[in-house]
Amino acid sequence: MAAMAVGGAGGSRVSSGRDLNCVPEIADTLGAVAKQGFDFLCMPVFHPRFKREFIQEPAKNRPGPQTRSDLLLSGRDWNTLIVGKLSPWIRPDSKVEKIRRNSEAAMLQELNFGAYLGLPAFLLPLNQEDNTNLARVLTNHIHTGHHSSMFWMRVPLVAPEDLRDDIIENAPTTHTEEYSGEEKTWMWWHNFRTLCDYSKRIAVALEIGADLPSNHVIDRWLGEPIKAAILPTSIFLTNKKGFPVLSKMHQRLIFRLLKLEVQFIITGTNHHSEKEFCSYLQYLEYLSQNRPPPNAYELFAKGYEDYLQSPLQPLMDNLESQTYEVFEKDPIKYSQYQQAIYKCLLDRVPEEEKDTNVQVLMVLGAGRGPLVNASLRAAKQADRRIKLYAVEKNPNAVVTLENWQFEEWGSQVTVVSSDMREWVAPEKADIIVSELLGSFADNELSPECLDGAQHFLKDDGVSIPGEYTSFLAPISSSKLYNEVRACREKDRDPEAQFEMPYVVRLHNFHQLSAPQPCFTFSHPNRDPMIDNNRYCTLEFPVEVNTVLHGFAGYFETVLYQDITLSIRPETHSPGMFSWFPILFPIKQPITVREGQTICVRFWRCSNSKKVWYEWAVTAPVCSAIHNPTGRSYTIGL
């Protein structure tokens, strides 16, 4: 009946629903709504004014059907086109016991009937501070049924009483809630989802009013599992031609919600009576088509958003051909390497020596040869002579290198099939070039590899890269917390999945504070006793009430002088997609109050066979130390 169903957001068009409080003729209404261009209908499952009695006689045994027949629509239509709504009189957290008990029974009746119909989603209101019993009834329903419905909690972006203009300024108000103003509704949601133990089936339907809160409040909401945004017709303005439009601030919010692929629900009567109701939907389509186009990084990362991957271990494992292929497609990385090698060659070889001074350049971890090609291009660009060694431990990639040498490179390049730490070089290098960095800089063991290879670098030799630094930032993300929680493996400790890092394209998250530098490594390392173990303490000021779920890791590297690569958001190399950030989760979410400081301790540890990280939060409260002795995750040497 409709082109798209609930849960079908994606692609270029907007997925949208129409919210109605009363639907006398369901099939006719659904047809009319579909004709207007909407994909689904939000409607009460029972008549909103039909208060059932479950406790007292005689009303308890009132004869006749409780609601309309499921035969009015096909099973497929119930499954895809209808979102159920709870009757407005149901108040399971009422202080009046009779109302509470009756509401519990009515709520279960409506949820069970929704499950019987196979509804894809059910809308429930969160409109007060105490929703504890609502959470209990819903959790019990989720755990007892065999249905798969989603539950969308309808939460206002700004609490209704915050918009009252009848309150005299500075006069005391009667409400006694702990949180006021912009914080309030997020705290309702946060407490509710905590009571429901972060159930993946409970999401947010965010109701957007005419007044918007400050940016940090909006940022925080965008780290939540928002499945729908409810737009009342009353928030639309009118343009010169009489069509509904939104303010610039609202448009910016819609653009950000579109990135999260939320579905939009239009509620309320037509406030632009001379225009068709579908003009509200047409305006959303217009916004969708006119949003900023995705950049190269976003295009590359499409489909990988919030998808957890285990970090590569190229030292312990031999990479596959396709893995090399993906990294070789990066347009920025190799041009930066070429620029760094070019500058280095010009600095090391003066113009008058360009025909006699042959620089020995060693590519350590040559893979399938992209750095060898970048080096050859740099030498040609600089008009300097080089002699190249391509050192690679993966015997499969060596086949590719030998083919390159036979077909293209010739005697200028010597291919060496060996681990760089064990290779006995025939001569010392002027320049060593490597691409051994992971998302957290040193997590693919670049320090250990380059330290093991620097004995064949001349005393005045140069390493490209010369330095790299890892960065950490605290983040909040229900989505990522649930993704990590779902990674539990049968024969391992039940919390082992929280003691390992993940490479992930961060998407549905809120960064709580700016990234700070963690560990720095420099090459060549001239310390008499080389020790790559590290320990750091980082303190992050937090300016908003929130919840901590883990830490995002990034890195920056100086290839040579002013030539750099970075995945830190503030300095990210434009268009570079070789690395996604890394995520270090924590076992238990930690509530953080506005003005508090998050303190994290981070260790880099090692023994003769492996390297691992350990981490712990020590403020505002203490967590357990994660991954002690590398019990859940190590990187093999």
Swiss-Prot record:
Residues 308-615 form the SAM-dependent MTase PRMT-type domain. The active site is at 435 (proton donor/acceptor), 444 (proton donor/acceptor). It catalyses: L-arginyl-[protein] + 2 S-adenosyl-L-methionine = N(omega),N(omega)'-dimethyl-L-arginyl-[protein] + 2 S-adenosyl-L-homocysteine + 2 H(+). GO terms for biological process: chromatin remodeling; circadian regulation of gene expression; DNA-templated transcription termination; endothelial cell activation; Golgi ribbon formation; liver regeneration; negative regulation of cell differentiation; negative regulation of gene expression via chromosomal CpG island methylation. InterPro entries: Arg_MeTrfase, Arg_MeTrfase_PRMT5, PRMT5, PRMT5_C, PRMT5_TIM, SAM-dependent_MTases_sf. Forms, at least, homodimers and homotetramers. Component of the methylosome complex, composed of PRMT5, WDR77 and CLNS1A. Found in a complex composed of PRMT5, WDR77 and RIOK1. RIOK1 and CLNS1A associate with PRMT5 in a mutually exclusive fashion, which allows the recruitment of distinct methylation substrates, such as nucleolin/NCL and Sm proteins, respectively. Interacts with PRDM1. Identified in a complex composed of methylosome and PRMT1 and ERH. Interacts with EGFR; methylates EGFR and stimulates EGFR-mediated ERK activation. Interacts with HOXA9. Interacts with SRGAP2. This is Protein arginine N-methyltransferase 5. It comes from Homo sapiens (Human). The gene is PRMT5.
